Amino acid sequence: MTVEKTKTNPNNTIAFQGELGANSHMACMEARPNFEVLPCHSFEDMLAAVQEKRAIAAMVPVENSVAGRVADIHHLLPDSGLFIVDEHFQRVNAMLLGIKGAKVEQLTEIHSHVHALGQSRKLLREISARAVQHPD
């Protein structure tokens, strides 16, 4: 299911997997600042948005320099009929957020995206918090 936040012009729209504010959204805004964005629920929905001409392109994460390959894309892209036509490198800075007054040493669980957890594995080991995966 694709989530459309606003009416978009498909010829000036770039689709991405995730919510507004996700790393892929930031990459879209940096790489194509004059494009409208189309947030999609899944990688399949993102690719379908281009196949169905609801977007002219998709910002597709293929690799994370710390956490490695984005495996789902490497399985989906070959059968999509789509091709890589450009490349963008997105710098990502992770931050640990908590409620006011929370102390790092009291944390028992950290909820985040699988790749963000992978990038933070040293911190997670240091504070002995359990990693809980979320889509975004």
Residue ranges and their predicted role:
Residues 1-136:
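Domain-level signature for soluble enzymes in the chorismate/prephenate branch of the shikimate pathway
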